[in-house]
Amino acid sequence: MKLFQIFPLLLSLTSVTLAADDFCNATGFQGQSVVSTGHDVKKIGNIDYEQWADGGNNSATFYSDGSFKCNFSNTKDYLCRSGVAFSQAKYPSEIGHIEAEYRLVKKSASNVGYSYVGVYGWTLQSGISGVYEYYIVDNWLSQWRPGDWVGNTKFGDFTIDGGVYTVYKNVNGNLTQYFSLRKSERTCGTIDVTAHFAQWEKLGLKMPKITEIKVLAEAGNTGGGCSGSVEIPYAKIYINGKDQDGKSKGGSSSGGSNGQGLGNGQGNGQGQGNGQGQSATGSGKCPSTITSQGYKCCSSNCDIIYRDQSGDWGVENDEWCGCGSRVPKTTNCPSSIKNQGYKCCSDSCEIVLTDSDGDWGIENDEWCGCGIKNTTPTTTTKKSNNSQPTQGQSNNNSSTNTNFCSTSKHSGQSVTETSNKVGSIGGVGYELWADSGNNSATFYSDGSFSCSFRNAKDYLCRSGLSFDSTKTYQQLGHMYADFKLVKQNIQNVDYSYVGIYGWTRNPLVEFYVVDNWLSQWRPGDWVGNKKHGDFTIDGAKYTVYENTRTGPSIDGNTTFKQYFSIRQQARDCGTIDITAHFEQWEKLGMRMGKMHEAKVLGEAGSTGSGTSGTADFPYAKVYIK
């Protein structure tokens, strides 16, 4: 089951929730206090706390009500946390239902390269193999949300306890890390920790035994020291509705003295205590769309906690199971959707977008028609052979080499540029542009090119089709690009885009389709001030961003839009369906104008002293079919 298309009946296996203003306005810092200036793992009252840092001058004050204050100066990595620790590691199912409440006040932060604020824990006694560390991140002290660099496996976006989180796994030697990163930061709230554990388990991320559950503030910088101050005036960990002092959350407990919270089947020996223990073996019925994935059916009295295209789901014994016998059926949807090659959604679909074609949902990470809506069908012209570009048509309008990933080499006439230049060779448009440094680029009449840069703050070279800004992409025809990239001696690259680049007018838009990068990390959420999400475009997953910028453009210094599609998995060679990206953007309300250019691009930059290296493109074609 793929959870990025779930239609959540949100996990509600929790106790009564306190009204937000009961702790979101808390001033905290009550009771006894202790000041820590070194690496301390200690206890105050019933509260377990820790401060840890890699260098710098740091301190933290912890209070017996769970609240704490953290101050750090010139540290490479700093964390302070407060909550619950166990003398013996326990599996989450042995602990009960876990929740955290917190309030965050950011006081100051400078030179913070990465940061996590939320719930944290780790263990040396995993009960599996190796060391495990987990993060549920609701906020951050850095300028940008943590990006895909946190993990070497990205599972996608999931609705967990009412919020959308991106889930990652990272393995570094003996250390395994799990992350849930909230898409929209918040400074106060309740985190259903058990709901995250359950989601991770469903994705195959087996939960180890854990030794702590704490509210965390962490900040660091791999390039130098960071400094700042943060306060957590409210921090509580609840297990089965009770905090460390035995006080009930909201005046009620989520599990009795004998129960074990989230359906671990223990209760007082028969799964009947005051908790929510349930049968260890399902006795109910559920559709084969669930059992064929290896999941069991729940018991007959199960509670549905969300639905997707496979059926209805519950949780028993800390594992997902099929709840009920409803078999999803494919619904009908307008021909204006089916005629574009899209399928109809299942009968449990949720409408996420409405346009002139009808209502749209998402299932299996792909768009689908969600029910019948009476509309006037619109025709989308996907191919046209009548309109041609003003430049580059004669030698670059089609791809004839089907083996370009293995047999490519530069050919034809060539020209070498050593300064900023917009030109053409053999009907192929090209450009070299750089901000400082010693740079050059060689462009060939077959469309291929080679880019060399040294100590440049920003450098780009590109080759492809140029237009006269009189026709839309629909009028020009279906646009594709083939490319092959060879990276050589890349150094000190902080950001980079390799793929397709161009501009439109009316509206003025700068656009990127990014299939690779010369930097160590994939471009992150910092590229755009609006993140539309992840979409399957031409068979691959891309994250789509939109940005509004004021600065240099093809029409001088002005305000313009930027659109990005950033591929989740980099590739060195392939075919990009450019029109498919344009169509996806327009479906999201990102309007395209009249085409000025579409070119294969290599761009690299550094926020520091400058970047150096070579990006060779032995094959590059932009063409219209």
Swiss-Prot record:
A Pfam match: CBM_10
Repeat positions for Sequence: 259-268, 269-278
Stretches for region 2 X 10 AA tandem repeats of G-Q-G-[LQ]-G-N-G-Q-G-[NQ]: 259-278
UniProt-listed InterPro entries: CBM10/Dockerin_dom (IPR002883), ConA-like_dom_sf (IPR013320), Dockerin_dom_fun_sf (IPR009034), GH11/12 (IPR013319), GH11_AS_1 (IPR018208), GH11_dom (IPR033123), Glyco_hydro_11 (IPR001137)
Signal sequence coordinates: 1-19
Pathway: Glycan degradation; xylan degradation
Domain GH11: 35-231, 416-617
Catalysis: reaction(s): Endohydrolysis of (1->4)-beta-D-xylosidic linkages in xylans
Location of the region described as Disordered in the Swiss-Prot/TrEMBL record: 245-283, 379-399
GO biological process per UniProt: xylan catabolic process
Known EC number: 3.2.1.8
UniProt keyword Hydrolase, yes or no: yes
Keywords, ordered alphabetically: Carbohydrate metabolism, Glycosidase, Hydrolase, Polysaccharide degradation, Repeat, Signal, Xylan degradation
Location of the CBM10 domain: 285-324, 332-371
Annotated Gly residues bias: 252-276
Group of enzyme by EC: hydrolase
Function: Hydrolyzes 1,4-beta linked polysaccharide backbones of xylans, one of the major hemicellulose components in hardwoods and softwoods. It is more active against xylopentaose than xylotetraose, has trace activity against xylotriose. The major products released from hydrolysis of xylooligosaccharides are xylobiose and xylotriose. The reiterated 40 AA domain is involved in binding the cellulase-hemicellulase complex.
Name of the protein in question: Endo-1,4-beta-xylanase A
Species of the source: Piromyces sp
